[in-house]
Structure formats: C-alpha cells, structure tokens
Amino acid sequence: FAEIGAGQETARHFFRAGGASGTIAKAMSAYDKDFSDAIYGIEDDKRYVTEARLRKMLDHEVNLVEERILREAHPHKMFFAYANTVATIDFAKKYKGHGWVGIKYQVDPDQGYNEIVLHLRFKETDARLQQETLGVLGTNLIY
C-alpha cells in the first residue's frame, strides 16, 4: 500500500479490521511533498494529485514487490500494489477534494498485471468523512 497526501485511510482500515498480516506486505505513507518527490520523482507539472502520479506510484511499488519477494521462493503467490494520491477538502471549504486511486494485481502468478484506476470527486463537506469514504473505497477495491 502506498498512500500520499490526505489518503492514509485504506491501510488504516485493513489494520483496524485485523488480518492485515496475510494481505499487507508493506504500507507506505508520504504526506510530505519532498519525501514523496524523493520516492517517486517530481512531476513535470509539479502536481501531486494526478493520474500520472498514481501510475508512477503503482509501477514503483510493483517493481519493489518483485525485487524483494523472489518469484522462485513463492511460485504460487499473486502480487498486487495499491496506491492513492488524494487531496481532501481544504479548511476554507473552497476546494472540495478529489483523488486518484488504483491497483495493479495478478490473477495468475505466471501472467502480467491487471490495472484499475479511478478518479474520485468527494461530495462530503467534512475532511473526516472524505477520509472514511476513501478508506471504504480502497478496501472494497482491493477485496
């Protein structure tokens, strides 16, 4: 799981529900923009909540899984990477909040990855409700 910006909610939902040890190999949160840039690079447009950023995150995280968990040692294991980059509603309630959520996953360990990418526009007017929505959405997407 890699969640940047205001979106550290999906991993929280998994940890809160229990059973995360059988699903989550790694949870990474980068709320700081400089730290995020150090991991994923700087986007040409200098924006963080974009489809391009999400796709870069997914590719990076899948590559890390494949580097760190050897296929020879786990020939039947299917891998996935979940990521989101989100901005929730601001304090002045001028910007309503939106984000990008995605998952790359295998349905067969010997084949490539499928991919789902979603763009969200939050309708809630409270940041906590937006975070809860994101956590539920991410959990259901992974399920």
Task: Give residue spans per PLM region.
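Non-catalytic terminal extensions that flank enzyme cores
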Residues: 1-143
